[in-house]
Amino acid sequence: MLPTVFIVSDGTGITAETFAHSILSQFDQKFRLVRVPFVDSLEKAYSTVEKINEAAVHDGRRAIVFTTLVDSVSNDIVKRSNALVLDMFQRFVEPLEQELELKSSHAMGRGHQNADTEEYKTRIEAINFSLAHDDGQSNRNLSEADVILVGVSRSGKTPTSLYLAMQYGVKAANYPLIPEDFERGKLPSALTQHREKLFGLSIDPQRLSEIRNERRPGSKYAAPENCRYEINESEAMMRREGIKWLSSTHKSIEEIATTILQEIRLERQSY
């Protein structure tokens, strides 16, 4: 029976879930994850406790709860459940209040109340830009890009571009390197005037073949020898052109994005 882990929040729960994943990944154990977002009333807090207690009875062991509930009354209700409750706000906010000699607002969802802020507008603009400039769809306004990701097809360019846009408000375009580019031995002409904005992604050829086979099984596009050729050529081109690059093979999207921000020295515009 897998231990049950609850992610309880008065908002989306993204913060609590990210923290929970970081902690749980330290253990060689699988977990059953239950997300309980928008617990913004006492009624919902009591309902959450019922779910937690039912899981404890079913599993024959206490549940594990990661919580970011700001309301102290709701928090106290959840803490009475049959669970190990890991309260992120109590753990971090109270020591900060003491250190800063300043009371926190204890306002629910304050971290996400940004719909009218410049950060939110910047993020939406970045998302629209990244979608419009995905996979070399458009060369218009490439000069507005903060970064242009290059690499062979299925090397992780699209998810990384969108993550940079959604998480940090970075205008990230991405452009594929294709066999015709390797035959010419040159970057696509649309990219040459934006060389300082280029960042490359590569990937292990075997892993690339596996990913491409899911999309087009048995094709030349997915063949191991073709994948090796494309990766070798793309890495040679990036070295020749002086383009910074990394392998996405064993890295999460978060790690890739953070590395890119560090390498091109972009400020994180949103959080």
From Swiss-Prot:
Function: Bifunctional serine/threonine kinase and phosphorylase involved in the regulation of the phosphoenolpyruvate synthase (PEPS) by catalyzing its phosphorylation/dephosphorylation.
Upper classification of the organism: Bacteria, Pseudomonadati, Pseudomonadota, Betaproteobacteria, Burkholderiales
A GO molecular-function annotation: protein serine/threonine kinase activity
Sequence similarity: Belongs to the pyruvate, phosphate/water dikinase regulatory protein family. PSRP subfamily.
HAMAP family to which the protein is assigned, alphabetical: PSRP
Record's keyword annotation contains Kinase: yes
Catalytic activity, reaction form: [pyruvate, water dikinase] + ADP = [pyruvate, water dikinase]-phosphate + AMP + H(+); [pyruvate, water dikinase]-phosphate + phosphate + H(+) = [pyruvate, water dikinase] + diphosphate
Class of this enzyme: transferase
Binding site for ADP: 151-158
Residues in coiled coil: none
Enzyme Commission designation: 2.7.11.33, 2.7.4.28
Record-linked InterPro entries: Kinase-pyrophosphorylase (IPR005177), PSRP (IPR026530)
PANTHER family listed in its UniProt record: PYRUVATE, PHOSPHATE DIKINASE REGULATORY PROTEIN 1, CHLOROPLASTIC
Keywords: Kinase, Nucleotide-binding, Serine/threonine-protein kinase, Transferase
Stated name of the protein: Putative phosphoenolpyruvate synthase regulatory protein
Organism superkingdom: Bacteria
